[in-house]
Amino acid sequence: MNRIAFLVCSAVFLITAQIQAQTSINKPKTAQVMGKQTIYQFKVQDLSGDTFDFSSLKGKKIMIVNTASKCGLTPQYKDLEAIYKEYKDKGFVIVGFPANNFASQEPGTNKEIETFCQQNYGVTFPMMDKISVKGDDMAEIYKFLTQKSKNGVQDSEVEWNFQKYLINEKGELVKVIKPRTLPTDPEIISWIKG
């Protein structure tokens, strides 16, 4: 009798374990469900105060760059505008975010920034409202760009003005490019064309 009870208990245990194992294989992990978000959830203000909805960029490759008017890297505006003009009709867009986080190199108002960009570099790519890209007052979009728990790819820190974030056609972060890397770098151009 004890042997039969043992066999029945063993069979029930094995069946229960098999069902639990199968359920855990088919059930996505919490990190996967909560993990990777996309850029399309964000709405921000542009330099004119109008709403800019990132969902309007679905299907395009996006370069997000934090900018400054009084930085040694400010001449990158010229290259940014050049690649924007060359590839904007081929599914690519640049979105600039002025930020005053590094040595107070973007002290101007939105209007002053807009005038500076147009007069000095002929900027036509979308430029957003001045935000913070670091610290306690970091904008939500930059939390997405810099936190693996939100972007599902990597943690990063904005090192300086003109750091670039490459977003694929699905709205997912794919690469972070250092500030000193020029927008015309072969790796970036290859990614745009790919």
Model-derived features with residue positions:
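Short, internal strand/loop/helix patches
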Residues: 111-160
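N-terminal "domain-start" segment that seeds a small globular fold
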Residues: 23-55, 140
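Bacterial Sec-dependent N-terminal signal peptides
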Residues: 1-26
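Thiol-/selenol-based redox modules, centered on thioredoxin-like
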Residues: 140-143, 147-194
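Conserved helix-turn-beta segment immediately C-terminal to the redox Cys motif
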Residues: 60-62, 70, 74-98, 117-121
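Thiol-based oxidoreductase modules, predominantly thioredoxin-like and allied folds used
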Residues: 91-108, 124-135
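Amphipathic alpha-helical repeat scaffolds
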Residues: 46, 66-70
